[in-house]
Amino acid sequence: MEKFTIHTGTAVPLRLSNVDTDQIIPAVHLKRVTRTGFADALFSSWREDQAFVLNDESYSGASILVAGPEFGTGSSREHAVWALRDWGFRVVIAPRFGDIFRGNALKGGLLPVELELKAIEEIWGRIEADPSTSITVDLAARQVQVGGVNWGFPLDEFSRWRLMEGLDDIGLTLRHEPLIGAFEASRQPFLPTIA
């Protein structure tokens, strides 16, 4: 997983609330277990509408999604995180996330940033007025900066550390590879049975 310290990019304003994982990536696209190749599936039902914000070329190349309350609710789908990452998003900013989505995002290298709705509305206004508006997300400082305005965001220390170190679950486990190898080398090749 790629390390995350500071990210600067443009953003897409998704003025919708209660966006569930089935809307992020419909179930018909869940037939693969690889983490890539899902960009075309992201919001595929909504993207059929040419007026949908991801179809607007002025937001092309954006790496931050700014959404409404309750983003990523519904069933657990790692594919939702994979689709967002595959599209190019590194950060999703919203007032509240579904708990399972939030956990999957943190483990998948997508930073879920929670800001108050008032801050979200200000950011929406800025990026709609000028789609080239730059947003900086500083994970070390736990701050979002747009223009000269800064907002702090909460994130537990362990999740912050994992993202800054670029550690997914496998990477975290591999940090203990010497200990795991020593244990495996010292244990019996079979387990005793109880007669």
UniProtKB/Swiss-Prot annotation:
It comes from the Bacteria. Its EC number is 4.2.1.33. It catalyses: (2R,3S)-3-isopropylmalate = (2S)-2-isopropylmalate. The keyword Nucleotide-binding does not apply. Keywords: Amino-acid biosynthesis, Branched-chain amino acid biosynthesis, Leucine biosynthesis, Lyase. One of its GO terms (cellular component) is 3-isopropylmalate dehydratase complex. The keyword S-adenosyl-L-methionine does not apply. GO terms for biological process: L-leucine biosynthetic process. CDD domains: IPMI_Swivel (cd01577). InterPro entries: 3-IsopropMal_deHydase_ssu (IPR004431), Aconitase/3IPM_dehydase_swvl (IPR015928), AconitaseA/IPMdHydase_ssu_swvl (IPR000573), IPMI_Swivel (IPR033940), LeuD (IPR050075). GO terms for molecular function: 3-isopropylmalate dehydratase activity. Pathway: Amino-acid biosynthesis; L-leucine biosynthesis; L-leucine from 3-methyl-2-oxobutanoate: step 2/4. Belongs to the LeuD family. LeuD type 1 subfamily. Catalyzes the isomerization between 2-isopropylmalate and 3-isopropylmalate, via the formation of 2-isopropylmaleate. Heterodimer of LeuC and LeuD. HAMAP family: LeuD_type1. This is 3-isopropylmalate dehydratase small subunit. It comes from Salinispora tropica (strain ATCC BAA-916 / DSM 44818 / JCM 13857 / NBRC 105044 / CNB-440).
